[in-house]
Amino acid sequence: MKSAIAGAVLALTTSASAIAADRPVPPDPTLEFVFEEEVALSAGVAVGTTPYGGRSIAPIAGGTFKGPEISGTVLPGGWDWQLLRADGCLDLKADYFIKTDDGVTINVVNTAVACRTPDGKPGPVRTHAVFEAPNGKYDWMNRQTFIGSLVPGDEKVQSVRIRFYRVK
């Protein structure tokens, strides 16, 4: 019985190795800088404790963005949804609009998880952004994968600074 099981395991692992060896290895992704934005936030609204954690929301008050091929303003009126989880991490989901200098309005939905490092310091915050652009000059944004890096923004106003990168 033991030899039958050992034989079956050996056959499965040998087959899996042979199959894996025949397949091409996916290329490592690279990043291309797209733009940096400074997003101003209004005073947050505490929703309270929910079954998922401590919920709050912060209205997006506006801002600016600039990159090599795209720049403009962050429109007021969006929201940054925040959930403080039981493990101390913060789930973030921002939904807002940007308007390019040439008049195109683009929806941004940006999500992240912000956690502290084991020594209690703020850890790096990486985001995943989805853009919804109208057909035309910026519709390439609808077909790409984007990640971002988020840090606190200008100390004079409550804001965050995010650098967006296209994954290639």
State the predicted function of each range.
Residues M1-A4:
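Positively charged n-region of N-terminal signal peptides that target proteins for export
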Residues A21-K168:
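Beta-strand-enriched cores of mature, soluble protein domains
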Residues A6-S15:
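Bacterial N-terminal signal peptides
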